[in-house]
Amino acid sequence: MKTLGLSLTLVFSLPAMAHLNGAKPHMDPQMTSAEYRNYLSTQKSSNKNVKTLEDLDPRIEKSIKLGERLSKWVNKINAGRTAETAIRLTSPETRISYPINKPNKYNPTILAAEATALETSMPKAMVDVIWSNSELPADTNGIDDKTFAAQGRLLDRNYQGAARYKSLSPWIEEYKWAAASDVRGYYYLKTNNIKAEDLTDVASMSPEKLDLVKEALFRTCRNYEGTKETQCQKVVDESVTNNGLADLYNFTIDAAKTNWDSFFKITESARRKDVTWLNDIMTVPFNTPELTKFIPYLQDNIEDEFRFGTWGLKLNWGTFENGPRLVFKAGEVPHVNGLGGNEITMDSNQPIEEYESRWTIRHEFGHVIGFPDCYHEFYDEKLEAFVNYQLDTTDLMCSRAGNMKERMYNELKEAYAPTAE
C-alpha cells in the first residue's frame, strides 16, 4: 500500500485544472447550420484559422458539400412558398440535446458512415438530387414535406458535425488538453452514490461494475492538471492489483468535485463590482445601444429570463465606461470577452427576431454576470474523435433548450446579495 500511496502523491501533486480556455472559439454544441455557414464563410474570407476544404479529410469535405447542396435546395423550394409553408430543418422542437450520459461523438469516420447510411436510406428522389450536380428543382421532387424535412434534418445534422470538425480542428491540441476536465467520472460516482467504503473489496465486485468504476476513477484522476493518460491508467491498474480503489477514490474525489463545480460556479474573479441587489431586485448597468430597436431586444429577453419567484433582474440604461455593451460583427460566433466581461459580440447576419438570437443573448448575458458554460467538449485521443455533452440539458448555460434555474438564482444570490450583518 505504501507503493500505491507514493504513486498517488506523485501523480496528484498539482492543482485541479480549469476547464476554460480563452483561445478556442466559443461554439455551443447546438449551433445551427446557418451559424456554421456564417462562421466558416467569414473565416475563409479573412484567411483565419480554418483549413480550406482541400486541406481537410475528403470525408469531411464530402459531408460539407452534401449539406451545402441540401441547403441550397431547401432555399430554392422555400423561395416559392410562404413563411407558413416553408420547409424548416431546424426548430426548437426538433433540436437534439447531448446529455452527459449520451455524448455527441464525431470524426471523419463516424461522419462518413452516417453519410453513407443516409445515401442508402433516404428516398431515391432526394439522393438523385443531393448526390449529383444536376440543376436543383424548385420543389421536393415528388416527396411529401414531412418526409423531406425528416430526412433532410438527418443530413443537415451530418453537415453540422462536419462543419464543427472543420471549425475546431485548428485548436485540436487545446481540445486534447480539455480531456483532463471530463466530468463523467465524477458524474458516474455521484449519480450511483458510490463512496470510498463501497470500494474496499475489489474481489467482491462484478467484472461489469469494476470496469465502470475503473473508468470513472481514471477520469477523476485526469481532473488534475499535468496528469497524463498513461500515469492515470497505471495508478488505476495498481489500485486494482493492491485493492486500493478506496484510496484512489479519496485521493481524487475532491478535485473531481471542484472540476464539476467549475462549470456552474461564479468565481470571485468573475463577479461584477457594479451590480446592486435590493430586496428582490438585482440591477445591472448596461450601455444604451445607439439603435433604439436593440433596447427592447435586450430588455425583453434578459429581464424575462433572469427571474425566479418574486426576484428579478433589471437593466439600468446609461453610459458606463466599464459597463456591458452590445456589439455586432458579421459572421462572429456570439461571445463575451471573458466571464464578468463587458462586450457582448453578436453575429450581425442573424436576425434578432429569430429564436436562436433570442436564446443567445440570454445565454451570453449569463457570462456578463459571471456564469461559465456548463457544456464540455474535448478531443478523445483513444477514440480519435471530438466529444461534447451538456451537464444539464434544462439549464440556460448548458443548453439551448434550457432556462434560468433555481441553482442560478442561488449562485447569483451568493455572489451579489448583501450579507446580513
Residue ranges and their predicted role:
Residues 303-311, 367-374, 417:
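Sec-exported extracytoplasmic/periplasmic mature domains
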Residues 1-21:
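Classical Sec-dependent N-terminal signal peptides that target proteins to the secretory pathway
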Residues 359, 365-382:
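Catalytic Zn2+-binding segment of zinc metalloproteases
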Residues 381-421:
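Post-HExxH zinc-binding segment in Zn-dependent metallohydrolases
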Residues 341-362:
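Short pre-active-site segment immediately N-terminal to the catalytic Zn-binding motif
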Residues 295-299, 303, 362, 394, ...:
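Extracytoplasmic/secreted envelope proteins and their assembly/folding machinery
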Residues 281-339:
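Auxiliary, metal-adjacent structural segments of Zn-dependent hydrolase domains
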Residues 18-304:
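N-terminal low-structure segments adjacent to metalloprotease catalytic domains
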